[in-house]
């Protein structure tokens, strides 16, 4: 789960890291109250989970409460790369002398944690690494030992931080690691980590991602979810314990197993190129226990998306045999009818694996005109794309 900047700032503050005084506002009136509390010159920053806010006009300076209200009014409601601004963060300004970069992240490729540090802060770190790689230090972190003062000093020194800030930077690095671990984060990034004219260090930006798989250890993280940005179908699927992600397409996808579903997305996208460019409408993994109730819930979620014109059910029978899945599909359609959900869009079903022949026979015997059985994955994807294109 990616946090907004103000949420990351608050998280850093809770862990004792030096951040700017500020607050978050959803209305110009709230912005006025924050500006009056802070006093003097402030920065008004759009809260969206994309970069490029400054170039889009989403970051503005303001002097006094009236100007802060005007800036907040301009920014609230803006569209920045498809994201509507619902909140602004308002902080005091800082007298910045130098800018550095510091982050910890989960390095999935190497199955470890990674620290990245640079004296070239305030810029895109990937650009810095590409153009001046000598300015970027990358240090693997052993999860068993973590980051203590000695290791932090080694990283900070290698990165070339000025001698006068090394001690402070070491303290920040250690505390930031503690926050990273305590919150089960997959990324904490500070860009820039600034040295002020008075010589102190401040974390002027906060980019934080939390591991949703560790949410059971952090009931407080639930409050960080932006309900206004949550897709209602994804929320409904979550409540039914379904792994669903909405996409921008016309072919609904239901499969058992994340790997199979990902492959299904690929073959449908490829087939769709030959049928008007139709695309997968979602990712939905119903897991191994494809009971009638689970299948009905899955179909209900997928068919609740008005952009879906056809549904591709792709199942490889393993522990759950294909005949059980086929019965689940037939019963699911009947169950949806009982719920008052009139199903009119076609289902293309491909079954393979354990008891596939028996499952196919069940589908054929159901004589349901909505069910079209295709026995190959490519053929089923082709048919689903064709039906979706015809229904668009």
Curated annotation (Swiss-Prot):
Binds 1 Mg(2+) ion per subunit. The keyword ATP-binding applies. Its EC number is 6.2.1.5. Keywords: ATP-binding, Ligase, Magnesium, Metal-binding, Nucleotide-binding, Tricarboxylic acid cycle. It catalyses: succinate + ATP + CoA = succinyl-CoA + ADP + phosphate; GTP + succinate + CoA = succinyl-CoA + GDP + phosphate. GO terms for molecular function: ATP binding; magnesium ion binding; succinate-CoA ligase (ADP-forming) activity; succinate-CoA ligase (GDP-forming) activity. ATP binds at residues 45, 52-54, 94, 99. Substrate binds at residues 256, 318-320. Its cofactor is Mg(2+). GO terms for cellular component: cytosol; succinate-CoA ligase complex. One of its GO terms (biological process) is succinyl-CoA metabolic process. Mg(2+) binds at residues 191, 205. InterPro entries: ATP-grasp, ATP-grasp_succ-CoA_synth-type, ATP_grasp_subdomain_1, Succ-CoA_synthase_bsu_CS, SUCC_ACL_C, Succ_CoA_ligase-like_bsu, Succinyl-CoA_synth-like. Pathway: Carbohydrate metabolism; tricarboxylic acid cycle; succinate from succinyl-CoA (ligase route): step 1/1. Signal peptide: none annotated. Residues 9-236 form the ATP-grasp domain. Succinyl-CoA synthetase functions in the citric acid cycle (TCA), coupling the hydrolysis of succinyl-CoA to the synthesis of either ATP or GTP and thus represents the only step of substrate-level phosphorylation in the TCA. The beta subunit provides nucleotide specificity of the enzyme and binds the substrate succinate, while the binding sites for coenzyme A and phosphate are found in the alpha subunit. Belongs to the succinate/malate CoA ligase beta subunit family. Heterotetramer of two alpha and two beta subunits. This is Succinate--CoA ligase [ADP-forming] subunit beta. It comes from Salinispora arenicola (strain CNS-205).
């Amino acid at each position: 789960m990616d946090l907004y900047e103000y949420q990351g700032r608050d998280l850093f503050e809770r862990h004792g890291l030096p951040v700017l005084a500020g607050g978050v506002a959803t209305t110009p009136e709230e912005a006025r109250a924050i500006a009056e509390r802070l006093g003097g010159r402030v920065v008004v920053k759009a809260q969206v989970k994309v970069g490029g806010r400054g170039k889009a006009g989403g970051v503005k300076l303001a002097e006094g409460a009236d100007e802060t209200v005007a800036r907040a009014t301009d920014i609230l409601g803006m569209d920045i790369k498809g994201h509507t601004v619902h909140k602004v963060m308002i902080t005091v300004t800082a007298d910045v002398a130098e800018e550095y970069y510091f982050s910890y992240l989960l390095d999935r490729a190497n199955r470890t944690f990674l620290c990245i540090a640079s004296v070239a802060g305030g810029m895109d770190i990937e650009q810095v690494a590409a153009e001046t790689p000598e300015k970027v230090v990358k240090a693997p972190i052993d999860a068993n030992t973590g980051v203590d003062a000695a290791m932090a000093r080694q990283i900070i020194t290698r990165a070339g931080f000025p001698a006068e800030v090394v001690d402070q930077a070491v303290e920040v690095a250690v505390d930031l690691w503690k926050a990273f671990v305590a919150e089960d984060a997959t990324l904490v990034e500070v860009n820039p980590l600034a040295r002020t004219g008075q010589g102190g260090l401040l974390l002027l930006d906060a980019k934080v991602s939390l591991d949703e798989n560790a949410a059971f250890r952090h009931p407080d993280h639930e409050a960080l979810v932006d309900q206004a940005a949550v897709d209602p179908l994804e929320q409904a699927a979550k409540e039914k314990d379904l792994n669903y992600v909405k996409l921008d397409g016309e072919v609904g996808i239901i499969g058992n197993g994340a790997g199979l579903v990902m492959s299904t997305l690929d073959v449908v996208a490829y087939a769709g190129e030959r049928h008007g460019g139709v695309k997968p409408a979602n990712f939905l993994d119903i897991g191994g226990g494809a009971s009638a109730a689970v299948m009905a819930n899955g179909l209900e979620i997928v068919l609740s998306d008005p952009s879906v014109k056809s549904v591709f059910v792709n199942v490889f029978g393993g522990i759950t045999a294909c005949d059980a899945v086929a019965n689940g599909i037939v019963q699911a359609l009947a169950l949806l009818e009982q719920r008052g959900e009139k199903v009119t869009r076609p289902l293309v079903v491909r079954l393979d694996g354990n008891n596939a022949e028996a499952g196919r026979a069940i589908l054929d015997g159901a004589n349901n005109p909505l069910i079209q059985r295709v026995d190959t994955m490519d053929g089923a994807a082709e048919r689903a794309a064709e039906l979706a294109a015809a229904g668009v």
